[in-house]
Amino acid sequence: MADQADLLESPQFEEETSMQKFKRRLKEEPLIPLGCAATCYALYRAYRSGKAKDSVEMNRMFRARIYAQFFTLLAVVAGGMYYKTERKQRREFERKVEERKAQEKRDAWLRELEAREKEDKGWRERHAAVSEAANNPVGVSAVVAGKKEEEEKGVDGNVNQAPQEEGGVKRGTGILDAVKALVRGKKD
């Protein structure tokens, strides 16, 4: 377990972009691109010799292409054996980084899911309270009576209320007012 933490905190390995990786691999194994370039040059020269109808030069260039490909393959195998342990460590490091990123992504997803669930639960509770208030006329009248008492005490400072008629009787007492009272009652 300690070696995994050391592997993640090791200054030897760090996350790199594709260009950084290309440059690093070019510095580690410069013979592979050299062999590829030699192969391409031999093919180009063989093509030019074929166009010039020089079959001797063309055959010579095709042999040079085979030698260049052998050299490239040899460089790949030798580099693979030489950098075997480092590549294994780097793969392990990259695997750990990917696991960490996947875990962070999963945790963020779970947090979002919990927030949505909490929001949905709150909506269901509000919906249940509204349904109960709408279905229970006794509860509505009790809520309306409680609201009238609050208005008389001057506790209710809501500007967006229906205007009151003369004589203190409020116009528009109904389900909407009951719902507002329920919501306000839960906030207090």
UniProtKB/Swiss-Prot annotation:
It comes from the Eukaryota. The chain crosses the membrane at residues 30-46, 66-83. GO terms for cellular component: mitochondrial membrane. The keyword Transmembrane helix applies. Keywords: Coiled coil, Membrane, Mitochondrion, Transmembrane, Transmembrane helix. Pfam families: HIG_1_N. It is found in: Mitochondrion membrane. The keyword NAD does not apply. Residues 3-94 form the HIG1 domain. Cytochrome c oxidase subunit which plays a role in assembly of respiratory supercomplexes. Belongs to the RCF1 family. Associates with the respiratory chain complex III/complex IV supercomplex. This is Respiratory supercomplex factor 1, mitochondrial. It comes from Talaromyces stipitatus (strain ATCC 10500 / CBS 375.48 / QM 6759 / NRRL 1006) (Penicillium stipitatum). The gene is rcf1.
